[in-house]
Amino acid sequence: MVFVGREHELASLEVQYNSKRFELAIVYGRRRVGKTYLLHHFLASHDGAYMVGLESGASNNLEMLSQAVYRATGMIETGKLQSTLPNFPTITAALTHLFEYSLDHRCIFIIDEYPYLAESIPSVSSELQALIDAYKNRSQLMLILCGSSMSFMENQVLGHKSPLYGRRTAQYKIKPFTYIEARQMVPHLSYEDSAIAFGLTGGVAEYLSYFREGDSLDESIISLFFTPTGRLVDEPSSLLKQELREPRQYNAILSAIAKGASRNNEIATKVDMTTGALNNYLKSLIDLQIIEKIHPVGSKSNKSIYTIKDSMYTFWYRFVEPNQGAIENFNGKLVYHQYVKPMLSHFMGPVFETMAAQYVQARIHQGSVPFLPQQIGHWWGTDSATKKQVEIDLVAMADIQADPNARPVRHLLVGECKWKNEPIGQDVLGSLMERARVLHGESYYWLFSKRGFGFVSDDERVELIDVPMMYEL
């Protein structure tokens, strides 16, 4: 797999390495997002060792730890995978040997899947705490703990009740790629097809690596999602089984959200559950970064709705899960062409809104946005004048106070996103200007179009942005 992005994370890891002091870096993020690949890339140019915690017993994990410590401390000859030396008798002995070695040597030690190690040897975090406190002022060890269990890493490693609380010197929450980064994984695809690949994978690095050069987009989608042996044909369901108890309930909830239910009571009705019971399931899905609870930009949270954050889950629950029988009977190609492909533009609507928000963020970094937004998101609500419901795809907002004696002035960048096969007309701009009126601010208007525009505008407040422009920043 080609190494893409992660420049900020790599630069920060290098700063930590060059400090020559004790460092404890916590790296976490959802499965398949590229954490391990990042750490291997970083370790390739430095001395150190890497181990993976096993979903196994304490003795197996102690063996893995012992071998990694021998490797880190130069006790395994170059080219040999394992030492003939006996395992350390305890985890304390293994880690103490590592810390002692680090008094005179700069060394990196990475424990991947740390939650598995901690589950098999529950005392490991406390033992690390004691060793860190004893050695931190003299040690040159750069210790990296990595994990995919979001709740474990946030609560039992970073949380204030963790023995390791306050010991970390940096933390890295590894997120899926933006659409611009995802493009580097599929350079053989057109811009439009790259956008669809981003939507189908949620920007997850490993999934993007499955798109083979030489295959058309249709061929890739069919082979990944709509064949019995496809690599993504049961991926969301499989991940839920790894992460959660009662996967059947979570499947039902995600299916309901993917098909349009967004408010607590709507979802509860669809899955035949009380709203109180539902809240616990929703919280777990939020912790896993599969769904998110959002509210209109600048508004109170009592208008909040739930939406699937990972667009691959939306695609899977909307198109793959309902057709699993046909896929198992080798009719997935027919399913794709008859039922899925005609609906791809509809599926891409929210994905394109996500891309537009990421484009605005990229422009902010370039310094080419009229003002610095304090919030970016969606807006929906009621027009007090017409009493009609209003939705705006993209709103970037800031209340700017230029004079300490004056009231802040609201600045708005409002956007409309159209993933359609025809150019946008001027009526879309007029509609956006009318709807933006309800937000009461000094507004700029950005239109995002899959297929360009049927008009030009000389209004300095207006930008017309097509897909190639979004990729050619």
Residue ranges and their predicted role:
Residues 1-333, 337:
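Phosphate-binding site recognition
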Residues 297, 306-473:
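A cross-kingdom feature that marks ATP-driven nucleic-acid transaction machinery
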